[in-house]
Amino acid sequence: MHFSNNSGVRINYKITGEGPPLILQHGLTSKLDKWDWYGYVDELKKIYRVISVDARGHGKSDKPYDAALYDRKIMASDIISVLDREDIEKAHYMGYSMGGSIGFGLAEAFPQRFHSLIIGGMHPYPLADLELEPGVKALDLMLESLEHGMDVYVGGIEPAPDERELTHLLSNDPEAIIAATIALRDRPDISEVLPTMTMPCLVYCGDQDGLYPGTEECVKHMPNVTWVSLPGLDHGDVMERSDVLLPHVLDFLANIQ
């Protein structure tokens, strides 16, 4: 394990492989091991120095309980703390879901530190009114169940997670996940960053994801973007389908000078 320190919050990360540095950042309730589970690291490490990061509040990173400490700019600065700890001036970045939100934060505050940004299942618009089902605000529903404990939250997930995923989800600290969820729900609109994202960007999303309309819209305002729509996949499916996603990612990265 490796740790960086960002204003007293320790950020856990793992390094695999050699080559140009590539940061991997997971989504809400997840951890860095997911990139290994679904085959991303095994493929990417053949070409890249893969740096998988546990977001604050997740995995082996520190877990503050104050939602203000999960502000997108602060979480973006966690990534910079990892780069600085490893003396890396510039890297590629790939983030899914909450990790995608952090990616927009990096574009806003630290664009000079990245050769490229790969953002999945996320857009820069407000999320408070996100509905995965008509009339149901997704993050409010998630918070309501989390307030009763991780077991209640996990019990409401459909389809039910397998044993490995179940064990992981139940290991989360509910107070930290609540704080991170509140911050994600209440984050401001930063769509004004889109026209400034001049570095090569790949944006991808499953077309059955509730975030798809906003994600499809945001790429219209990005000057240097490759858009990948993944047919038949919802928000939970995409991370697991490295067989579908990785060819797009590898092709995109191979064409960056």
Model segments located where?
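Short beta-strand/loop motif that positions the catalytic acidic residue
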Residues: 197, 203-205
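Conserved alpha/beta-hydrolase "nucleophile elbow" surrounding the catalytic nucleophile
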Residues: 91, 95-100
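Conserved HGGG/HGGXW glycine-rich cap/lid loop of the alpha/beta-hydrolase fold
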Residues: 9-62
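Catalytic histidine-centered segment of alpha/beta-hydrolase-like enzymes
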Residues: 233-246
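Flexible "cap/lid" loop of the alpha/beta hydrolase fold
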Residues: 101-109, 115-146
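Active-site nucleophile elbow and catalytic-triad environment of alpha/beta-hydrolase enzymes
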Residues: 178-193, 208-210
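Active-site loop/oxyanion-hole signature of alpha/beta-hydrolase fold enzymes
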Residues: 42-45, 52-92
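Catalytic histidine neighborhood in serine/cysteine hydrolases
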Residues: 220-236
